[in-house]
Amino acid sequence: MSKRDYYEVLGVHRNASETEIKKAYRKLAIKYHPDKNAGDKAAEDKFKEISEAYSILSDTQQRVIYDQYGHAGLNGGGGGGGSYSSGGFGGTPFEDLFGDIFGDIFGGRGSQRSRGRRGDDLRYNLSINFEEAAFGLETKIQIPRHQTCGTCDGIGAKPGTTPRVCPTCQGAGQVRVQQGYFSLTRPCPECNGEGQIIDQPCEECHGSGRVRGKRTLSLKIPAGVETGSRLKLSSEGEPGLNGGPPGDLYVVISVQDHPLFQRDGQHVICEIPISFPQAALGCELEVPTLTEKVNVKVTPGTQSGKVIKLQGQGFPSLQGYARGDQLVVLRVEVPTSLTDRQKELLEEFAKEGGEEIHPMGKTFFDKVKELFG
């Protein structure tokens, strides 16, 4: 069975604002919530359907994908250097719904959320390579987000008209009601907590004062970042509502693995294989670093695991301190196959050093016979 259109599920048009989508979701979620419809399977299925629709349409990036590709687009994967999400680092549709309800009960919160509200924080995941993390880079990123409507300058009203003060709450956005012994503050039902009423909404933004768009930002990544490093761009998140301040943008770094190097704090680790003759006799190796190749001397008699330090060839700290070092770890490789001549030479080498050779010529059963007679 094919899924219904998410906009149809919530009962909103495809150009609905974030506020309109949230309002529709809250209304339906309260109506079909399982706690209110115990044992009603149809209500439970309806609640799941509207929750799924809201989880997609309330997420800026997911909504863009859905608008362009429909349900099929949400099942695919993405690629590229960056990904985007809205709403900062927490928050769910259920928190929005029940946070508003409890805010209504205890008073005050409904007005704070609806009048002069701060815009949502945004998160952008940026993938960079190992060298870029070591030396920093300047790049551009494109963020899908809402922008102030250019037709109505963010007012939400049709050009040439202005919103009027709500006659019920006198612009306060909330009303006080008496329930038993309690005096409760609720969002004004006349203006939905906005404090004003728009009789002729702007046709471009449908009264929200915001339109969907994209913003290109120049970004400077400092040298020394690592996976999980977070850069904050103040006021580059979603614009606020009703004159509220914009949110912030957080760029979260992910550093790609390198085929040769590993990172340990400020140090770079590089394992270099050498042969037994090179280790025994000494040699000179050409070793790669983050910037160039350098020559390294291996002293005679070098053991596997020896570390050679290349000073200043590592990562800087984010505080601007000196760079760490590159640690070259030498790994002596033992040959897995030998020619007859090579075997003879090694046997001579061992005898010359007074070592006794025990070739693995005897089978397991030969050893058993010798042991038990």
From Swiss-Prot:
Protein name: Chaperone protein DnaJ
Pfam families linked to this entry: DnaJ (PF00226), DnaJ_C (PF01556), DnaJ_CXXCXGXG (PF00684)
Its biological purpose: Participates actively in the response to hyperosmotic and heat shock by preventing the aggregation of stress-denatured proteins and by disaggregating proteins, also in an autonomous, DnaK-independent fashion. Unfolded proteins bind initially to DnaJ; upon interaction with the DnaJ-bound protein, DnaK hydrolyzes its bound ATP, resulting in the formation of a stable complex. GrpE releases ADP from DnaK; ATP binding to DnaK triggers the release of the substrate protein, thus completing the reaction cycle.
J domain location: 5-70
Keyword entries, A-Z: Chaperone, Cytoplasm, DNA replication, Metal-binding, Repeat, Stress response, Zinc, Zinc-finger
Ligand binding (Zn(2+) 1): 149, 152, 202, 205
Sites where the protein binds Zn(2+) 2: 166, 169, 188, 191
CR-type ZnF: 136-214
Family: Belongs to the DnaJ family.
Domain notes: The J domain is necessary and sufficient to stimulate DnaK ATPase activity. Zinc center 1 plays an important role in the autonomous, DnaK-independent chaperone activity of DnaJ. Zinc center 2 is essential for interaction with DnaK and for DnaJ activity.
Molecular-function GO terms, alphabetical: ATP binding; heat shock protein binding; unfolded protein binding; zinc ion binding
Record's subcellular location: Cytoplasm
Residues of the signal peptide: none
Co-factor(s): Zn(2+)
Cellular compartments per GO CC: cytoplasm
CXXCXGXG motif-type repeats, residues: 149-156, 166-173, 188-195, 202-209
SUPFAM superfamilies xref list: Chaperone J-domain, DnaJ/Hsp40 cysteine-rich domain, HSP40/DnaJ peptide-binding domain
Subunit structure: Homodimer.
